[in-house]
Amino acid sequence: MGPHSWLPLFMQLALLGPQWALHFYKVKVFVVPHSHMDVGWLHTVQESMQVYVPDVYNSVVEALTRGKRRRFIAVEQEYFRLWWDGFASAKRKQQVRQLLAEQRLEFVLGGQVMHDEAVTHFDDQILQLTEGHGFLYETFGIRPQFSWQVDPFGASATTPTLLALAGFNGHIISRIDYDLKDTMQHTQGLQFVWRGSRSLEARQEIFTHVLDQYSYCSDGFMWNGSPRFPDRPFDMDYSAVEMPVSQDSMNHYVLNLVDNVNKRAAWFRTQHVLWPWGCDRQFFNASQQFANMDRLMDHINKHTPELGISMQYATLAEYFQAVFAQDVSWQVRDHRDFLPYSSAPEQTWTGFYTSQSGLKRLARRASALLYAGESLFTRYMLSAAHRFLDPAWALTQLQQLRWAVSEVQHHDGITGTHILAVRDMFVEHLTTGMAGVRKLMDSIAQDMPLTHSGPEPGGHVAMVYNPLAWTVTTVITLTVSFPEVSVTDESGRPVLAQVQDSKETPSAYDLHVLTTIPGLSYQHYIIKPIRKAREDSQEAAATVPSTIQFGLKLRRQDGQVGRNLVPVKNSCYTVFLDKDTNLMHSIWERQSNRTVRMSQEFLAYRSVYGYEEAVTSDNYLFTPNGTAEPAWAAVRMEVVEGQLLSEIRQYFYRQANDSDHTYAIYSRLAHGPQDSAGELLCHRIEQEYRVGPLELNHEVVLRTSTSLNTGLVLYSDNNGYQMQRRTYRHDRNNSVSLNYYPMAQSAFIQDGGSRLVLLSEQAHGVSSQGNGQVEVMLHRRLWNKLEWTLQYNLTHDVTSVVRPVLWLLLGPRTLTTGLRQRSGLELQHRPVVLFRELGGTVQNGPGPRKQEPVTLPPSLHLQILSIPGWKYSSNHTVHLKNLQKGHYRRAKADFRRVLLRLHHLYEAGEHQALSRPVTLNLQSVLRGLGSVVAVEERSLTGTWDVNSLHRWSWKTEDGHHHRGSSRRPLPPLRGPNVTIHPKEIRTFFIHFQEQ
């Protein structure tokens, strides 16, 4: 293009006005090439690997090798690992190592997936980051330092805290409320220092960048077309979306890009513009992409004086380094999150908090099984003898479930925002992984010492394992086929048990057994049918409760309630039931001596149906057509009163003449020991629900209405890590959906005298739509005619029945504050029951010794106890030398190095006693596992020695200029003593002596 042909373009740029003039000669554009590769959304992982993923990595590596200035960031490690292990040639692998050494290829975030931030539990966020970081560090010796959370539907305040603990220096998010983003753009507030934890504050702050309204895609600058499913073209001939950059098209591209850049530059405080270049499933033909951008970039840089911008390819590290070098004091954001997320008026993304409820439950149960399997395997491997187990095989079983649990944390995975084939993929991977870990635990159970002398063969041995690091007293429930049963411990002593008709299966029986198990320990129970023919039998039978039936009652609208009450109680609560309605009426709580009015019922929101132009509920959105209405017409009730527990069974019928119920509430109160061991068991009402199948375009909630004067204030958790205060937001058209929040593990409402806590074993949407009310969305069934839904079969027309579980805690704040966290963990990590046949007299040989319990103080939680099986040296210098020499190929897993993570459960100032720092001697606490010979403190995911971790220090407007670190600035760890402060998560490598 000659000088005269340049004049028309220059005139057009001048017409852009003051905005362009403002940034004349100033703007530096950092072009960050990337490909957004969903680990399951519209296509399965297998389909994506078949169609385009290997082409992305192969062509990107080739393109970067051909051009020294080119850059690329890679995000999802599940895809990269699959390519590295199954597709990459030796040449490609060497090229990757060279590009990493030159810092032209950068791994950002580094997890297995780009995890969701609303409905994931922080345990699983840490897991998926740990798995990805471990692979990258072991393979390349690198440690990601910048995040790329650009597609999750809202941003939690927990994620930035975890990333800071992992050693990150910068955090990128995108999807926040459209109106808030617009305000932040116009006030240049898209960049800030985020202190995501109210207790950790500046110690774990992180610089955060919110992508502007253009987000992570660069529309109009994609030259490699779109991948073709289900099969890639044999000749790799993809029709390009955009016309190539040429002399004829140059003016078009320059004008559009400069206009775009100058708009963006006005929204930020520095003249450094982050320009994400890429989008979903891009760069599978990277040479074509880079060839066009090279020409455009060369032209713009040649005319920088006229255009006022310069461009360069960049990694995130290069962009953040440039911003960090600026003399700017940044705004500080506190522990508030960015939830819920709205993309437009009346488009609030709160439906996915409940979508695919069954998958959400399976994912959380898989995580709990993995947690138990990790610690049981660790105890077993550290014991004196392990006769039957191949450690390599065992590690493979754990690894498969680690990957499956990590995979489903993807922001289109556990969210339920995927097609049904992808759901089936997640389910298959989770169930296969769970079967492997269950087989591993069964193998360990076979090797556990058991001495039992029985008069005759028959029955089963149940090994019940407590994966928590404190003594748990609880009731386990087993399903048996016989109504008369005895339960004894391995010494033959009778155990308190209760057998009753199954609440769901007419031909079976529920056997409830009271158990007390120390931390990381197990108990054996012998379960045998009692034979009536033996009249002289001395076997102690499980007790049989009495059952009272209450006839069908129609839903009443006259408000005449509370005249005929039936009490059901244990030592902590009395639940009053109304015989005239068959509904809960109120609860009396012992410690406060207060009776709180409380009723529960199922209601349904109806969504707009069938209209192509309407905004309607789908996998993502919750857009109800009005307020919730009762979803039932009649209810029947049973009360089962026993020595061990009392159970209230309420069956709700959609129509009064229905033969089968659609909904049910099963409420249990346990009659446990009256000492401190039974405190948690006594102070909870365990509820299980049956919901479904639903009518089409119905979204069903359980609403609990109380006499608490809550002022429409709700508290819900961020990923099970911390609580957020939610005040009611009024909106003319969208108040219902706008006031729904994710409940990953807990929520509560309160007034000056009492607090009602809900604990959940899986994620749900939760809301308070009225004073004293809290409602939990349990299930959804949706279908519409929107083009998007029909094109991809992205439907939520599920006819399943779901059985979620909630535990209720009621009492004064001091009581519930002390119990909420530990009760939530007892729900999340219930004892695991492992069965085996009992054949006459059993006297096992000298297997692993009966091990000592591991017990932590009540304010600390053993977040993980695991043998990761990593092969790398803990010494970074040694590890890099081993990589250079190729020694990693011959390295073996270290089974004496244990990953230990401790979490302080309480916020600073939350509880008078439990919020204090806790000092403990790790050598003493872990003596039940073996002899500790060395303790190393590590970053959250284990890849950094904290003594060598020095994160960037960002200047802030409040005057703090604090050098961030992965922990409280204390002297280096010397010896086994460690102090854990409120909300800290501390990670260690514990090295045990060889037996």
Swiss-Prot record:
Cofactor(s) demanded: Zn(2+)
Cofactor remark from the record: Binds 1 zinc ion per subunit.
Source domain of life: Eukaryota
Annotated compartments: Secreted
Biological process annotations from GO: mannose metabolic process
Keyword Glycoprotein: yes
Glycosylation sites: N285, N593, N625, N657, N733, N793, N875, N977
GO molecular function: alpha-mannosidase activity; carbohydrate binding; metal ion binding
GO CC terms: extracellular region; lysosome
Region: Disordered, residue numbers: 956-977
Family, per entry: Belongs to the glycosyl hydrolase 38 family.
Annotated protein name in UniProt: Epididymis-specific alpha-mannosidase
Gene responsible for this protein: MAN2B2
